[in-house]
Amino acid sequence: MDSDDESEAVHSVFNTVSQEGGKIFEQREILQIDYVPSENRIVGRDEQIEKVAGEIGPIVVGQPPNSIIIYGKTGCGKSLVAKHVSKIAREEAENRGVKLATGYVNCQQAKGNSDALSKYGRAINPPESGVKFPTRGISENEYFERVWSVLNEFYDAAIIVLDEVDKLNNDDLLMALSRAGEDGSVDVPIGVIAVSNKINYRDKMSERTKSSFGHNEFIFEPYDADQIREILQNRTDAFADGVLDDGVIPRAAALSAKEHGDARKAMRLLRYAGDQANKENAERVKESHLTDARASAEVDRLLELISGLPPHSKHVLLALANLTKNHPDREWFRTVRVREIYLEVCDRSGADPLSAERTRQLLNELCFLEVAGSRRGTGEGKGHYSQYTLLWDADIVLTLGN
């Protein structure tokens, strides 16, 4: 193909894309993961919203709130509720004449505490402050000082949402936020809403942080099939009128509910199905488009899960994937066998292996993320042992993990 033909082909592709998203989409952004719908579109989380708001409530009158940690698996509404409650709190505070700073930080995308502070600073920084929050070039203490100065000068209270807080290298940020008022760094009350997929995150906090970061905890359960169907039904105005076949939403909901009720996955699957229909220049989105889109959604979901894992979690996952790949006649592997291959992975990568107990903990964390599954077995001497199985395609894990 010469350059003119290539140019014409590219123009042809772009010409199929309208401002709204082709013939299929009307408002494609409604299916984006970070889209926060209005309250009447939030499904199955009324009780959780009320409880979180109750803990944060005093902030709207400028009083110290209770900080909280929200736990739960991916796609169960944790981030959505945190964002929604902080948004409503800001509006209610404004109605009462209280200037409330609110900011959201995805810690998986932050490169550490300094970057997280920089992102929060930019979110709350009014143009007239004259304070700068560069992406690099200043110390962590300087980022803190600049955040404190903005809060002290322009606000009466503050909320910070730390999504995927377990992805930070340490809990120093929680420690500093919890002690900011006590040590005189800041004159306004600060409420922290931390969000984590890891239910044992608190166990990894230092004793100092546990003592200082007084908080309440909530665990969000996965959505069921009916709730996911309602969530998707509430997002159908992402599509042009009449383009969705009747079976598309029930099928997408059933697929997602079967795999631990992940609403993010359901929306991603529906969005990809619409994209697939657009690529085919189809008039309607059919169930067959869901089938085609599912493979892409699976790869993206797994990549999202493992991209934020620390190196040794990836090493353990690769060990389990290698066992699965090399022993197609077996599904389950004992901890000691996984550890043997883990040691080989560490040797190849030049990493110092962790202890056997820590290896077991990392396997259990993979189970919590539903990358792996576990079961208990009984040996000849009536002793118990654990076995693990990979819940994803081994070839995909090996490709993405490396």
UniProtKB/Swiss-Prot annotation:
GO terms for molecular function: ATP binding; ATP hydrolysis activity. Disulfide bonds: none annotated. Keywords: ATP-binding, DNA replication, Nucleotide-binding, Plasmid. The keyword Nucleotide-binding applies. CDD domains: AAA, Cdc6_C. InterPro entries: AAA+_ATPase, AAA_16, Cdc6_C, Cdc6_lid, ORC1/CDC6, Orc1/Cdc6_arc, P-loop_NTPase, WH-like_DNA-bd_sf. It holds the Pfam family Cdc6_C. The keyword ATP-binding applies. Belongs to the CDC6/cdc18 family. ATP binds at Y223, R235. It comes from Haloarcula marismortui (strain ATCC 43049 / DSM 3752 / JCM 8966 / VKM B-1809) (Halobacterium marismortui). It comes from the Archaea. The gene is cdc6q. Involved in regulation of DNA replication. This is ORC1-type DNA replication protein 17. GO terms for biological process: DNA replication.
